[in-house]
Amino acid sequence: MRHWLFKSEPDCYSFTDLENAPGQTTSWDGVRNYQARNFMRDDMKKGDLGFFYHSGKNPEIAGIVEIVREGHPDITAQDPEAGHFDPKATPGDPRWYMVDVRLVRSFVPPVPRAFLRRQP
């Protein structure tokens, strides 16, 4: 089993959004970084765990998620109405991938990055 970091701006998609999602599960879509895409497409496996990390003004780990569906084409790349549209993505050559994650555990309170930096 491998472990991953799932980073999100809390004003775009927060841990609370995941808590309120049906089945506390969501597709981790919209990633437009080639190395992260390759990890999702090739390396992330069902059952792997990850930290849900809020970036931004108050960076913190809000909880733990589990990958429940391995890499599959990111449909937002092919939707002109989506904020992550890529005109070069096609059904035959999707270019971008996503995984589905489910909430495992929330950290109350969340673990601030400043605390993590003080750990050996």
Where are the regions a protein language model picked out?
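A broadly conserved detector of short glycine/acidic/proline-rich loop/turn motifs that flank catalytic sites
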Residues: 10, 56, 105-107
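Short acidic/glycine-rich loop or secondary-structure boundary segments that cap or lie
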Residues: 14-16, 59-63, 74-76
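Short, charged beta-turn/beta-strand-edge "cap" motif at the junction between a beta-strand
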Residues: 53-59
